[in-house]
Amino acid sequence: MSIMPLIISEKITEVIMSNQAFLDGMREIFHMTDRNNLQNILLHGLQNHYNTYKQVDISNQEVNARREKVERIYGHKIHDYVPFYFNPRNAMLYRNRSNARVIILGLDVRVIKDHRNGFLISNRNASADEAKFSKNLPDLQDPNFINFDDVFSSRWCNNGIANNDIKQKMMAEILINDVVYSRYICSIYVKDQASKKAIKEQLAGDLKMYNINVIVDLAKFF
């Protein structure tokens, strides 16, 4: 089920059609965390940066200072929001590639509509100076605001040269200013069978209660 209705127009461009294709196929948005945080997430929900339940922080401490900035739509700090990515295979995940406990939570896209009165879209890493924000779902269809071909680029570095513009756009975010409860979590993506086994053994009851699948998906990791 797409989160946006299909727009048909004689003037529709190839880029707009590309954006719509991504939206039509979108089933989940993603949040990265450490496996040791899972139990508290399932119990208390996903909360913003200031929550007291987080045991392990995998965020970039240098970037954290920039996420103290205040966005101009609602007047909140970026850290006041729970962050989600369209494309989890980005620079933040790459930075944590050596952490065997890093997992990716896949949340039903309905979480966006259910929190539409307190969410933002950023067209790149929300901490970037060039980041633009919107509270309007239709802007996801506008390639002048966000280009999903860039967001889902396969890489941001070619021949040893980094493209920081693409790097930032691959980290475009959905920001939700509320607790996001476990009922929205559809999947837990891990990089190996050992992680899957550990999670299922530790949290079997919770996984069954919320109907959450634990999936080994190497393609989502580095």
Indicate where each model-derived feature is located.
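Active-site-proximal loop/hinge segments that shape catalytic or ion-binding/gating pockets
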Residues: 2-222
